[in-house]
């Protein structure tokens, strides 16, 4: 995996690669950590992690993975209820990852509303909003909503929109494109993401069709 990245880009993505390798000590890629375990691996000694999961089987697996971990807790709580309840944190700094299952038709609307409620209480926090790209109208509406919220806060926040496609989107086909809205990112992140994504297009794209979108969303 290292050979695919330049000397400039490799240090940027190495922490992530190291986490994945830790779950695959025999070097064959058989296991992939989900976002809670990736987040846990990146915690500093002074950090803590709260994960919310209502699906029983997924929650049990997560509890088992984080058992006896004094820096992490798993709650049987709807994330939409937890989102406004847990912000702002006592530390006043932190990151909120919102990645719903998108099993309901109104999931994009709930994401927009949930983010708005949390952001109103904690506009200085950092947020990651993950979404599948299937309906361009839905993703564009979400991006505009987030841009409006961030731009209207005082002081105004910042946001980035990142989307990555491994193949052209075809109606009723499998998911080939996903996105992130990143609110209040570190100031270096835009350049770092661009460097990484430029080197991921070819190896991850199917038949040379890998593409990414990286921009500041507009209201």
Placement of each model-derived feature along the sequence:
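Class I S-adenosyl-L-methionine-dependent methyltransferase catalytic core
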Residues: 1-219
